[in-house]
Swiss-Prot record:
GO terms for molecular function: RNA binding; tRNA pseudouridine(38-40) synthase activity. Formation of pseudouridine at positions 38, 39 and 40 in the anticodon stem and loop of transfer RNAs. This is tRNA pseudouridine synthase A. Keywords: Isomerase, tRNA processing. Disulfide bonds: none annotated. Homodimer. Its EC number is 5.4.99.12. It catalyses: uridine(38/39/40) in tRNA = pseudouridine(38/39/40) in tRNA. It comes from Nitrobacter winogradskyi (strain ATCC 25391 / DSM 10237 / CIP 104748 / NCIMB 11846 / Nb-255). Belongs to the tRNA pseudouridine synthase TruA family.
Length: 255
């Protein structure tokens, strides 16, 4: 039975998240319905990242085992046809070894959080960025963000319902980049805690507004208490940008 790796983009706005839910539509559910429409079987689609409700993906990765053999391009095109009108696109399909696991084979996950730092209302990017009308000091944000790099206990930035066994994670990258009114917060790690990225972003916005400084952010991290966290950024601006596996070309971001 061949195993297929799928690279997927989606607008998370209409979904209750990646993972199948009984109380609303999910990205996983839509993909599994599309696979069933093609092959007639119930097939589980396993994702590399279980994005929350409203969170988007530029290149989510998933795998599934299908009894029938498909040429990768035909599988991709068939899935896209059956996914309409959902805002989901299968960018690529490829046959991979049975040992490949979208989640457990991943070496690094890259997320981008987009902020529109402007007074004007959003017209085009509603639901796809976080509009922050007050000016942000992005240099201060970037400098403070470096305090979070490395291996730490991220309990402060962990949702109270997070089911991870350990609060320790290793953060490889956390950059804040401004391009006009557009601010991007780029982060990379092997894995994250539930709501970790949005919690870090919200706290960095407090730094950008001058409510916190870098020492305050370090103190929040050291407190290891959820109550010490700043606000949690909304899901609108968060994107799963890429998932790296063995042999992936490193993703470079120049400030």
């Amino acid at each position: 039975m061949p195993r297929y790796k799928l690279t997927i983009e989606y607008d998370g706005g209409p979904f209750c998240g990646w993972q199948y839910q009984t109380n609303g539509p999910s990205v996983q559910g839509a993909l599994e319905a599309a696979v069933k429409a093609i092959c007639g079987d119930d097939v589980r689609v396993h994702g590399a990242g279980r994005t929350d409700a409203g969170v988007h993906a530029l290149a989510q990765v998933a795998h599934c085992d299908i009894a029938r053999h498909f040429m990768p391009d035909r599988l991709r095109d068939g899935l896209n046809a059956h996914l309409r009108p959902h805002p989901i696109g299968v960018l690529e399909a490829e046959i991979v070894p049975d040992s490949f696991e979208a989640r457990f084979s991943a070496r690094r996950r890259h997320y981008i959080y987009r902020i529109a730092n402007r007074r004007a209302n959003l017209a085009i990017d509603v639901g796809r960025v976080w509009r922050v009308p007050r000016p942000l000091d992005t240099e201060a944000m970037h400098a403070a963000a470096q305090r979070l790099l490395g291996k730490h206990d991220f309990t402060t930035f962990r949702d109270t319902e997070c089911q991870a066994k350990s609060p320790e994670k290793t953060l490889d990258q956390l950059d804040v980049i401004r391009n006009g009114d557009n601010v991007s917060i780029i982060t990379s790690a092997r894995s994250y805690l539930h709501s970790q990225v949005r919690s870090m972003v919200g706290s960095l916005v407090w730094v950008g507004h001058g409510r916190w400084n870098a020492d305050d952010l370090s103190g929040a991290l050291a407190a290891r208490r959820r109550e010490a966290c700043g606000p949690v950024a909304p899901p609108d601006g968060l994107y799963l940008a890429r998932v790296d596996y063995e042999g992936s070309i490193p993703l470079r971001q120049d400030r």
